[in-house]
């Protein structure tokens, strides 16, 4: 086989993906959106801090919406048509991020809440006295 007929794909190139998994991690301080393929390889990620929000503004629902729109726009540019959504965390931006994903036009096969809930595991930290 000659060198011209072989296709060489670079490692860091853009991967076209039809179906993916959108992970929404919503903490009280930030919202992180990670888009992976079905095997778990990260395609694109975005967060409220990466979108330019600093300090307490990172924890707002508007910042979560901006992060979700940023990640979805980049994944649609790479050819994503269908996705599954995995949400975790109790943060204020989880519903707003999901609303932004729904508006984007990507077909959602299912939405799953994967927030870890202890069956009375570790002792929680003491209550704050402000």
Curated annotation (Swiss-Prot):
Recorded superkingdom: Eukaryota
GO cellular component entries: chloroplast; ribonucleoprotein complex; ribosome
Cysteines paired by S-S bonds: none
One Pfam family per UniProt: Ribosomal_S11
A biological-process GO annotation: translation
Subcellular location: Plastid, Chloroplast
Keywords: Chloroplast, Plastid, Ribonucleoprotein, Ribosomal protein, RNA-binding, rRNA-binding
Major localization class: plastid
Single GO term (MF): structural constituent of ribosome
InterPro entries: Ribosomal_uS11, Ribosomal_uS11_bac-type, Ribosomal_uS11_sf
Protein name (record): Small ribosomal subunit protein uS11c
Lineage per the UniProt record: Eukaryota, Viridiplantae, Streptophyta, Embryophyta, Tracheophyta
